[in-house]
Amino acid sequence: MALTNKNIIFVAGLGGIGLDTSRELVKRDLKNLVILDRIDNPAAIAELKAINPKVTVTFYPYDVTTPLTETTKLLKTIFAQLKTVDVLINGAGILDDHQIERTIAVNFTGLVNTTTAILDFWDKRKGGPGGVICNIGSVTGFNAIYQVPVYSASKAAVVSFTQSIAKLANVTGVTAFTVNPGITKTTLVHKFNSWLDVETRVAEKLLEHPTQTTLACAQNFVKAIELNKNGAIWKLDLGTLEPIEWTKHWDSGI
């Protein structure tokens, strides 16, 4: 999928990986990049506009833990202005197993809500045009880091939810896939806490392993969006993007 002249909504597009991804996206000659983020960063928005003045970059303050009704209201505003949106990127995430409810709210519930809200506009059963959802997960969604079980479980939920959305593409017209980074040099890794403090040095231990840069992540995120493979589970580790073949152990038969 060529991104030229596309309209993209990017949840958490100003964070470490998010900002580098936004930089890569505007280089693709989008029509509009709409960034929803909790923290305003006027300097970053100005930088994105300067990278490619042909792209309209818009910022809306947004906390992904806001109720579904509020998310829907915001999307109504965005769709009223843009008329169409082609891609939704769900990129919000925290890594702090001290904050159990917030971890689940940010990493999973918020993603479900933005997906649910945008279906009001995309669902072909309602006359919508369909669309593409890129959900940013984590390799811990395949194999948990046991010292952060809440974070790992929230990312496993992202993979499971996205697989279901992908299988509904023939019903809704909406395709979906996950991109799941390995250990990346961001503030997320430096600041997180383990569950019940079972490992006080978990951040340091992770950083002792090979990592990847936020730029490498960003470039591969955009590559995955351009590939637009419905149902793909992408592993993005050490700067390499590769598909994961999920093993089926049970079939509902539905």
Curated annotation (Swiss-Prot):
SUPFAM superfamilies, per database record: NAD(P)-binding Rossmann-fold domains (SSF51735)
Positions that bind NAD(+): 9-32
EC number assigned by the record: 1.1.1.1
Entry's Gene Ontology cellular component terms: cytosol
The keyword Oxidoreductase is annotated on this UniProt entry: yes
Keyword DNA-binding in annotation: no
GO BP annotation list: acetaldehyde metabolic process; acetyl-CoA biosynthetic process from ethanol; alcohol catabolic process; behavioral response to ethanol; NADH metabolic process
Outcome (variant: residue 77 to A): In strain: 0811.0 and Lima
GO molecular function: alcohol dehydrogenase (NAD+) activity; aldehyde dehydrogenase (NAD+) activity; protein homodimerization activity
Pfam name, any one: adh_short
Alphabetical list of Gene3D superfamilies matching this protein: NAD(P)-binding Rossmann-like Domain (3.40.50.720)
Keywords in alphabetical order: NAD, Oxidoreductase
Active site: residue positions: 151 (proton acceptor)
Effect of residue 225 to T: In strain: A57
Binding residue positions for substrate: 138
Reactions this protein catalyses: a primary alcohol + NAD(+) = an aldehyde + NADH + H(+); a secondary alcohol + NAD(+) = a ketone + NADH + H(+)
Assembly mode: Homodimer.
Family: Belongs to the short-chain dehydrogenases/reductases (SDR) family.
Full protein name: Alcohol dehydrogenase
